[in-house]
Amino acid sequence: TYLGRDFLKCCGHDQKWQGMTEVFEKLKAYNEKKLGESGIDTLVTSCAECFRTFAMDYELEDMKVMHTTEYLIENGFEMDLAVSEDVTVTYDDPCRLGRQMNIYDEPRALVKAVDGVDLVEMEHTGEDALCCGVSSMMSCNENSRALRLQRFDEVKATGPEIMLTRCPKCVSHFEGLQFEGEP
């Protein structure tokens, strides 16, 4: 069953990590009620932060919470995809998906399944992956910028044409470098 994009409200990840407990609890109560009424037994989400929040901070009795990459691998999804020209990519392990939820292999398996894609690893991967520097969008300052630049130096040293990640915060934070005149 596909519940649709508007079925739930925000998972409340940022509110929780910003200390907005009352707002988080309201979002959580609303979503738990909607999910409980839905009759589904598995909740699949593509957002690393939603995955972590639903799996660890919600009480979803008898409901399995999975990341999209886990679900696809576990259910034997056949990619049968190819790129028009060979491409080299690297994969950035998001903090929430990797270190907090131990999802490292599934995203890589899906990337490797695409014909013509060569996955190269950065110096720091898996549990040792460097953070993009953002935490609930609260710390976009010079310190977080230094973390972004350090991680992007690793990307450049690896030599890929594309960097992939499964976290919307990482994407927006890395894209911010373009507006600052960086890579």
Residue ranges and their predicted role:
Residues 1-183:
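Iron-sulfur cluster-binding electron-transfer modules in prokaryotic oxidoreductases
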